[in-house]
UniProtKB/Swiss-Prot annotation:
Comp. bias (Polar residues): 16-41
Protein name (database record): MFS-type transporter MFS19
Phenotype of null mutants: Displays profound hypersensitivities to cumyl hydroperoxide, potassium superoxide, many singlet oxygen-generating compounds (eosin Y, rose Bengal, hematoporphyrin, methylene blue, and cercosporin), and the cell wall biosynthesis inhibitor, Congo red. Also increases sensitivity to copper ions, clotrimazole, fludioxonil, and kocide fungicides, 2-chloro-5-hydroxypyridine (CHP), and 2,3,5-triiodobenzoic acid (TIBA). Leads to smaller necrotic lesions on leaves of a susceptible citrus cultivar.
Principal place of residence: membrane
The species this protein was found in: Alternaria alternata
One Pfam family hit: MFS_1
Glycosylation positions in this chain: 83, 86
SUPFAM superfamilies found in the cross-reference section: MFS general substrate transporter
Length: 489
């Protein structure tokens, strides 16, 4: 029975929630799958099949985040075409998409835990394609803003439930690499977007950025529709019970629980999950705030790059776009280090005993504190007109450190709540993180006008420095907090 569900792989999940699947294992004498090695159980899938599903959701997430900033270089063209003179409205043509990341998961993540991941992936992709077409053929700014926001809501689907898919098919001790690949989308996508979008806008126009996104989304959508399979264990077991009366007898606990609630009650309970997690779990709240600050910092830096590398260092428009690669290289190096160390450290710390989610915070403790150093290096080197390689190295340090906050933070939430509630935990994280990405960039101009690049980035460095004790706190007291502040889902 060790391979029956993700809940079995997550010993700490029981302290967080009353999982129907966990109840099934402890209270029923029979394995709900009929066989602990059943091929129907996603945890028992062959490695190539698991890797394919991780790759698809990771590419889906990367594409969704590419679209967040790929349009940004073309925003001035849209502003000119639609006669936009208000700088805030122009900024909203980019930021509203990211704001959609906060609202979409509130419905999509709970629905995936009730009705399955696959139907949400397919529905989100179809809706996303439709709204992307709307963006590409918009005839006025109001039409564009509405479609842009709705695109963000649809794009949030894979970001909020992808972690659930990873948890569905990978045991805890193998989850680090898979989650690292999945979590790279929100980090690397916004970095690569402006580079690609800059050349697309330069040689075509802003509408072509959406046509390229449309092509990419169509390919991913077809792959999802024809090759992906459902991974949610609870949904698969319910379907199994409906197919076979014999299986239904072994699932009486789960079925009886479901029958006590109407569909609307089940949906309301599921939708309120992310809010309950934020309100009653200090772990979810502080991890979400920490990742939100880092996510917002990255988007804020994007607004300064044209000013710094064109205004201070004299880069042309095309070359200045390559400055974004500093962040990207730092994140890529961080990904390599994380992939090598994450699961290895978990195994070493386990030492034959029960592993704990807090062991995922070790790398955050080690590398998170270097992010403020990158802020200071970037800001003051640009302020004093030091050679351009120095501020780019500063952004690389920011990218490296940010990765070791965002990815371990997400894995910690997934390991803490298990496959049954991973999507809701990540939805809570997105609910906090996305507004930082959407709106923090709007304060860049007044911040730097008043404080200069040096002190402005120092303020950002001090803010990130204030959050560095968070992983140390949870590494020491996380298990106690999870036991004391139990979120009844």
């Amino acid at each position: 029975m060790a391979h029956s569900t993700a809940g079995d792989r997550d010993p700490e999940v029981g302290s967080e929630q009353h999982s129907s699947i966990a109840q099934l294992h402890t209270e029923s004498m029979s394995d709900p799958w009929g066989d602990s090695n059943s091929p129907e159980n996603p945890l028992n899938w062959p490695a190539p099949k698991k890797n394919f599903h991780v790759a698809i959701v990771s590419i889906f997430t990367l594409t969704a985040n590419l679209a967040a900033t790929m349009f940004a270089p073309g925003a001035p063209q849209l502003a000119k075409e639609f006669n936009i003179t208000n700088s805030t409205v122009e900024a909203m043509t980019v930021s509203l998409y990211v704001l959609g990341f906060a609202f979409g998961p509130l419905l999509l993540a709970p629905l995936s835990e009730l009705y399955g991941r696959l139907i949400i992936y397919n529905a989100c992709n179809a809706v996303y394609i439709a709204f992307t077409v709307g963006c590409a053929f918009s005839t006025n700014v109001s039409m564009f803003l509405v479609f842009r926001f709705l695109c963000g809501c649809a794009a949030s689907g894979p970001m909020s439930i992808g972690g659930g898919t990873v948890a569905d098919i990978t045991p805890q001790e193998e989850r680090g690499k898979a989650m690292a690949l999945f979590a790279m989308g929100p980090l690397l996508g916004p970095v690569l977007g402006p580079i690609i979008g800059g050349y697309v806008s330069q040689y075509t126009n802003w509408r072509w950025t959406f046509r390229i996104i449309l092509i990419m989304s169509g390919i991913i959508g077809l792959a999802t529709m024809f090759f992906m399979r459902e991974t949610n264990a609870a949904v698969l077991l319910r379907r199994k019970a409906k197919r076979s009366p014999k299986d239904a007898e072994g699932m009486e606990l789960e079925l009886d629980k479901t029958k006590k609630e109407t569909p609307s009650q089940v949906l309301v309970r599921a939708i309120t999950r992310p809010f309950k997690m934020l309100l009653f779990s200090p772990i979810v709240l502080l991890i979400s705030l920490y990742t939100g600050v880092l996510f917002g910092l990255i988007f804020l830096l994007f607004t300064t790059f044209p000013t710094v590398f064109q205004g201070v260092y004299g880069f042309d428009e095309g070359t200045s776009g390559l400055a974004y690669l500093g962040l990207g290289i730092g994140m890529f190096l961080g990904l390599v280090v994380f992939s090598i160390l994450s699961d290895k450290l978990l195994g070493q710390k386990q030492g034959g005993t029960v592993s704990k989610p807090e062991q995922r915070l070790i790398l955050m403790k080690w590398f998170g504190p270097i992010t403020p150093l990158g802020c200071f290096m970037y800001g003051w080197s640009a302020y004093h007109h030091v050679h351009w390689i120095v501020p780019i190295l500063g952004t690389s340090i920011i990218g490296f450190g940010s990765l070791f906050v965002v990815i371990p933070g997400q894995i910690y939430l997934v390991d803490s709540f298990g496959a049954e509630a991973a999507a809701s935990a990540l939805a809570a994280n997105l609910l906090v993180r996305s507004p930082f990405g959407a709106f923090l960039g709007l304060v860049a101009a007044p911040l730097y006008d008043r404080l200069s690049l040096g002190w402005g980035n120092s303020v950002l460095g001090f803010i990130t420095l204030a959050f560095t004790p968070v992983p140390w706190l949870f590494y020491r007291y996380g298990e106690t907090l999870r036991t004391r502040f139990v979120v009844k889902l």
